[in-house]
Structures are given as C-alpha cells and as structure tokens.
Amino acid sequence: NIDLEILKKTKSFCLIHSKEINHPVGSSLNKRVLKSLGKADFVIANSKFTKELGLKLGLKDIHVINPGCNYPIVVSETAREFSKNIYGNASPKLITVSRLDGRKSHQNILMSIKNLLPKFPNLKYVSIGDGDERKNLQKLRKELGLEKNVELIFNSTEQEKVGLLEQSDVFVMPSVVYKKSVEGFGITYIEA
C-alpha cells in the first residue's frame, strides 16, 4: 500500500529538454504539458535556451542544470587503429556524432566541406550516426563528389566512436530550427 500522506509531501521535479515544450501555444498538447509542469515543485531545464522557451510559455522559476556525461573511455589499440585507417594522413580531421535528422543540418556540413576543399584538399570529415536523412546524405555526398573526403558511418561501437573523436581536430555540429524542432542541448557536445 502506498501512503498518500507521504506522497503528498514528496517534492516533484520535471526535467525539460526543449522538444517537449516547443508546441504551438494554445494547442491541446501545449496546454497538457503546461498543466503538468505547473504541478511540479521544481522545473529544471537542460540549457539557458530551454529555460527561455519555458519562460516564454509562462512557466516560472525554472532552474538550469546542464547535462553531464560519463568519464572518458580508455580507447583500445583496436579502436585507435580503426580511426587511423579512417582518417589516414588527413588534415584537418573533422567529425560529427549525431542522429541524421533535419535539425542537425548535415546537408549544410557537406556543402561546407565542398567549399573548404580548395583550401584544405586533405580534409577528412567523418559523420557517425543514422537516421531519416541517411539516403539524402548519401546522395548529396555523391552529387558533390565527396566520397574520398567524407566518411558516413551508420553503425559503430562505442570504442570506435571514442577513437575517432580522440583522433579528430574539430567537432562539427551546427544546429538549426527545423520546422518546430530545435536542438536544446546536444549531449554529444559534452562527449566531444
């Protein structure tokens, strides 16, 4: 049996990441979310950006606690060799780790790579992740003639991912508002 008196005294926390509160004002989903958040004793946003979204919706007293990540993984020799085989003697070495969806702006990265090649002909860009944009990005890579300079890895082990991150010079992750979707605080920024 649950003691209802204890439950009534228990403080409730609600963590918001931006996507779940970024619904049209006045929509039924917006009203339900605001009602639920209004019942929480503490509302915690994962970023200042998300806090601002919440304040615009009328939420009050939002606290910001940025997410963390696990301690760095010790990279195995196998993973180091894997990443050396991918990057070779490239310079600079760029990387993105994320889902392949519109709000991540991968198509803009590929177009930027194309524009950077005259100045950096040995550039290598690695994208690790999979998603709805997979076929579009494969097609765009081919259309732009980037097969030699762009590696799309759709499935990798954690060791391979960390090995590639360790070998890279620049972590690339633009974020755009895509329809009503926005990246509030990408965890991969911290992992990189």
What residues fall within each predicted segment?
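Conserved donor-binding/catalytic core segment of Leloir-type glycosyltransferases
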Residues: 44, 86-104, 110-113, 171
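Short donor-sugar binding/catalytic loops of nucleotide-sugar-dependent glycosyltransferases
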Residues: 97-102, 116, 131, 156
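Acidic donor-binding loop of glycosyltransferase active sites
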Residues: 166-182
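Nucleotide-sugar donor-binding and catalytic loop/hinge architecture
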Residues: 77-93, 119, 145
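Nucleotide-activated donor-binding/catalytic signature segment of Leloir-type glycosyltransferases, i.e.
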Residues: 37, 91, 126-128, 135-162, ...
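A short, histidine- and acid-enriched strand-loop-helix "catalytic/donor-clamping" loop
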Residues: 12-27, 39-42
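Carbohydrate-associated surface elements
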Residues: 49, 68
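Acidic anion/phosphate-binding donor-loop and adjacent secondary structure
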Residues: 21-27, 55, 69-85
